[in-house]
């Protein structure tokens, strides 16, 4: 196997999260969008995204839903410099795969962007430290 294929397999394994076998994803795109929108939290939306992804360009639309949900937790709380840092991290995801061809790489960038939003959501929604 080529190094490129092995790298792709490793990345797919890294972005997907283990889930219970009984959970099934909706078959249609619109139903998957609705599932992500109904998720009660950013983390749940991201987990459902991983479970129901296509690992193709269709993941861009799914990722947008996750990002919107996660951004609701923190976007208005960011200072100007924090917002610029967030935007830079999002842009880095796109640049990381910009020279790669194929829909799989659009999916990798979409996962990266969703992960950045999830990480910011976690940071800004933490409860008081005990």
Predicted region positions:
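Mitochondrial intermembrane space
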Residues: 21-130
């Amino acid at each position: 196997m080529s190094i490129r294929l092995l790298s792709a397999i490793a990345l797919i394994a890294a972005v997907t999260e283990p889930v219970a076998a009984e959970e099934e994803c909706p078959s249609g795109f619109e139903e998957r969008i609705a599932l992500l929108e109904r998720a009660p939290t950013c983390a749940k939306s991201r987990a459902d995204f991983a479970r129901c992804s296509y690992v193709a360009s269709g993941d861009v639309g799914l990722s947008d839903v996750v990002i919107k949900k996660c951004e609701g937790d923190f976007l208005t709380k960011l200072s100007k410099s924090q917002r610029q840092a967030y935007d830079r991290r999002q842009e880095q995801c796109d640049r990381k795969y910009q020279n790669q061809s194929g829909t799989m790489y659009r999916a990798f960038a979409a996962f990266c962007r969703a992960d950045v939003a999830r990480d910011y959501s976690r940071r800004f929604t933490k409860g008081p430290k005990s």
